[in-house]
């Protein structure tokens, strides 16, 4: 029996009681694996969450999609996009836009998720791709930012590459859900990219990621074994081929 699809209210009731699991998914195969494994939350691109097979393979995964403020230039753009995504099967909208945009969406009852700490689309303002809130002053500023997101109506924020003690204290002080990517176990969810877990990352693997399998290496090994089998004649074998009766074969040869 398929598990029931979780709601924002369900996730909120688990705050402080259970660490949720969260993945960035980009394919139907990853979505099916996440559903089978019992993953709680997924961040998925728009083209995946709107795929006609997505909810068939991941019916119970709470699924967030979104665009950055660089892609949605106005609050109305975000609202229009959010409506399309929720109608297609998304459960929440990621928004890296302003607090005014967050508030605008929340007033229209859109379940909206913000982003604090290292935010790739805004990294130039925090010194590039590096940790945030490593000083008392910057940690206080981060807390104030999270509180502002809560006041604006966001139900959650991704909190990325922040010292764990800072993230844990913010989580204690606020009702806002904190989804941790490199911010420690004191948050409400642990968030990794599927490609990092599966060993399929191109280039640098972030420090906060953990590689559980080496699919990239295994894929190359499988292809190399196929190449060697073809060269040696080990492939194809009889079980890979269609049989023909001897009588029909002889008739063909004599024809």
Question: What label would you give each PLM region?
Answer:
Residues 1-255:
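Alpha/beta enzyme core
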């Amino acid at each position: 029996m398929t598990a029931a699809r979780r709601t924002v209210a369900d996730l909120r009731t688990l705050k402080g009681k259970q660490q949720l699991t969260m993945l960035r998914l980009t394919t139907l195969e990853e979505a099916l694996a996440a559903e089978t494994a019992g993953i709680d939350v997924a961040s998925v691109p728009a083209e995946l969450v709107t795929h006609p097979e997505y909810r068939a393979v991941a019916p119970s995964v709470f699924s967030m999609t979104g665009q950055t403020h660089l892609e949605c230039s106005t609050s109305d753009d975000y609202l229009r996009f959010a409506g399309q995504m929720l109608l297609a099967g998304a459960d929440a909208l990621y928004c890296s836009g302003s607090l005014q945009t967050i508030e605008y969406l929340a007033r229209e009852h859109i379940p909206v998720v913000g982003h604090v700490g290292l935010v790739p689309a805004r990294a130039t303002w925090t010194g590039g791709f590096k940790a945030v809130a490593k000083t008392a002053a910057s940690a206080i500023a981060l807390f104030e930012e999270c509180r502002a997101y809560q006041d604006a109506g966001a139900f959650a924020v991704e909190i990325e590459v922040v010292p764990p003690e800072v993230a844990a204290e913010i989580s204690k002080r606020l009702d806002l859900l904190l989804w941790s990517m490199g911010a420690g176990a004191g948050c409400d969810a642990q968030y990794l990219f599927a490609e990092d877990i599966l060993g399929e990352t191109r280039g640098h693997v972030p420090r906060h990621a953990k590689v559980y399998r080496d699919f990239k290496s295994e894929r190359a090994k499988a292809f190399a074994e196929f190449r060697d089998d073809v060269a040696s004649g080990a492939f194809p074998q009889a079980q890979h081929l269609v049989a023909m009766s001897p009588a029909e074969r002889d008739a063909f040869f004599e024809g």
